[in-house]
């Protein structure tokens, strides 16, 4: 079987089908509005700048910030921003990774947590004069209700087919 992030992997095909289904329904004006959103947000705080990106400062699909990446890979993707903390998602797993140049915080996933725990996850970052306080929380969510609504609307199944 192809690696998970390979376009030929069954999960990628299932994701692509859902993505196309969504694009067909939201229409061009919403697609353009989403495309016009900034790729990053920067907030200046007492703890230093917080940079918020989807995956990394390099791009929306960059995979260099995962817990399995080497320090050199992480530094190549995230260093040089001048931020004291960088918040990102894309991995669908909550974690905090202190780096020499900044505190890296994966803020998690509400709908598809990949750690096997069927709980929505979110992160609260609080800036203090002493640095950052990171609270990563899990809460229950009605996954069955969401899946029922998806089926009723004809959204392709998330389960991959070989």
Predicted features by range, described:
Residues 1, 58, 85-98, 112-115:
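Active-site environment of divalent metal-dependent phosphoester hydrolases
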Residues 1-3, 59-62, 145-146:
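A short acidic, helix-capping loop that chelates divalent metal ions and anchors anionic groups
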Residues 1-42, 49, 64-82, 156:
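Active-site neighborhood of divalent metal-dependent phosphoester bond hydrolases
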Residues 38-42, 93-94, 122:
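Short, acidic/polar N-cap/turn motifs at the starts of alpha helices
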Residues 41, 45, 85-87, 132:
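Short, structured loop/turn "capping" segments at alpha-beta junctions
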Residues 53, 84-90, 104-108:
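Active-site neighborhood of phospho(di)ester-bond hydrolases with catalytic His/Asp-centered motifs
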Residues 53-56, 60-67, 97-99, 116-118:
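A short secondary-structure junction signal
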Residues 97-162:
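Acidic, His/Gly-rich catalytic cores of divalent-metal-dependent hydrolytic chemistry
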């Amino acid at each position: 079987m192809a690696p998970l992030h390979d376009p030929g992997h069954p999960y990628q095909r299932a994701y692509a089908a859902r993505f196309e289904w969504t694009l067909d329904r939201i229409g061009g004006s919403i697609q353009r509005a989403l495309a016009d959103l900034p790729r990053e947000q920067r907030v200046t705080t007492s703890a230093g700048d917080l940079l918020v990106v989807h995956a990394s400062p390099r791009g929306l699909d960059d995979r260099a910030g995962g817990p399995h990446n080497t320090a050199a890979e992480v530094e190549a993707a995230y260093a040089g921003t001048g931020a004291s903390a960088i918040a990102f998602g894309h991995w669908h797993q909550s974690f905090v990774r202190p780096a020499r140049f900044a505190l890296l915080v994966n803020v998690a996933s509400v709908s598809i947590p990949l750690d096997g725990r069927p709980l929505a996850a979110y992160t609260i970052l609080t800036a203090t004069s002493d640095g950052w306080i990171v609270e990563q929380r899990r809460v229950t969510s009605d996954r069955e209700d969401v899946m029922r609504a998806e089926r009723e609307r004809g959204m392709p199944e998330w389960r991959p087919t070989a």
